[in-house]
């Protein structure tokens, strides 16, 4: 069964500027009928453990589960030792447990486009991530938390398979249905291939925008702009169908990642409502 939720990244700039609180976000998510909120730990970085326990209790009162996202594991190519990433996971894990999360999403420290043409550096990052995941697994497994690496426009499908296999334990994939676009890949085969390894993930949408010359005679290139589900050109019915097929009936938590947010624009509720309605129709 696919459970639908929202990520606190939808409110990122408003949270950073103090326009809303995490408590406000939980109330909005509950009013939208979300099953859960994917909490990016960046948004609770200044809260003590006791405050996180209170936040988790409030979420439980209004019928929400909280799942947790950590951040970048480090950069092996720039000399980070695996202990750097392991230390980060241990710190995130304590906060994930306080929030009652059954999983911890993490990401590598690079984008493939930045290392294109440097396969030795990409392999260095792959080895680094494997070492970090292996080093963190004893504590993660002891806490009963699944450690999920997001497909973050970094590794290929085969590399993800090798990462999960070599790391072992509770390691899996946090599957973003749209991120393959950033690597100019068709997302459907990626979703189909990684779904069996995934337990949670993100969904968004995108549009392409031309970047014209000053006189408009030709374009300098194009940009990919992220949007809320249903606002762009992604074939979400096909992607959700591929996800469902790969899951084989397993539980999966899919959160809307609204990266198109602004500090002075309060539009999350009006954009999330139709996005969630669309997704509900696709997972029914």
Where are these regions (language model features)?
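Conserved beta-strand positions in the central sheet of alpha/beta enzyme cores
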Residues: 38, 67-68, 105, 199-202, ...
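Histidine-acidic metal/acid-base catalytic patches
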Residues: 1-10, 19-30, 157-174, 181-284
């Amino acid at each position: 069964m696919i459970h639908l939720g929202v990520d606190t990244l939808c409110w990122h700039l408003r949270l950073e500027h103090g326009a809303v609180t995490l408590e406000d976000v939980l109330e909005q998510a509950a009013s939208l009928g979300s099953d859960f909120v994917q909490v990016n730990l960046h948004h609770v970085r200044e809260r003590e453990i006791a405050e996180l326990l209170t936040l988790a209790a409030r979420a439980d009162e209004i019928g929400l589960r909280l799942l947790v996202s950590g951040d970048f594991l480090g950069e092996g190519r720039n000399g980070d030792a695996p202990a750097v990433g392991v230390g980060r996971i241990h710190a995130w894990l304590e906060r994930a447990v306080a929030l009652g999360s059954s999983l911890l999403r993490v990401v590598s420290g690079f984008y493939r486009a930045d290392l294109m043409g440097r396969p030795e550096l990409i392999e260095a990052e792959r080895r680094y991530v494997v070492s970090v995941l292996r080093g963190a697994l004893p504590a993660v497994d002891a806490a009963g938390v699944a450690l999920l690496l997001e497909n973050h426009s970094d590794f290929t499908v085969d590399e993800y398979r090798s990462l999960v296999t070599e790391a072992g334990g509770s390691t899996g994939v946090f599957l973003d249905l749209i991120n393959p676009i950033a690597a100019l890949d068709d997302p459907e085969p990626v979703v189909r291939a990684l779904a069996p390894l995934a337990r949670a993930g993100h969904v968004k949408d995108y549009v392409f925008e031309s970047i014209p010359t000053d006189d408009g005679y030709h374009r300098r290139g194009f940009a990919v702009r992220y949007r809320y589900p249903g606002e762009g050109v992604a074939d979400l019915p096909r992607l959700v169908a591929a996800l469902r097929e790969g899951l084989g009936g397993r539980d999966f938590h899919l959160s809307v990642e609204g990266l198109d947010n602004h500090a002075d624009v309060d539009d999350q509720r009006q954009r999330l409502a139709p996005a969630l309605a669309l997704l509900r129709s696709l997972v029914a």
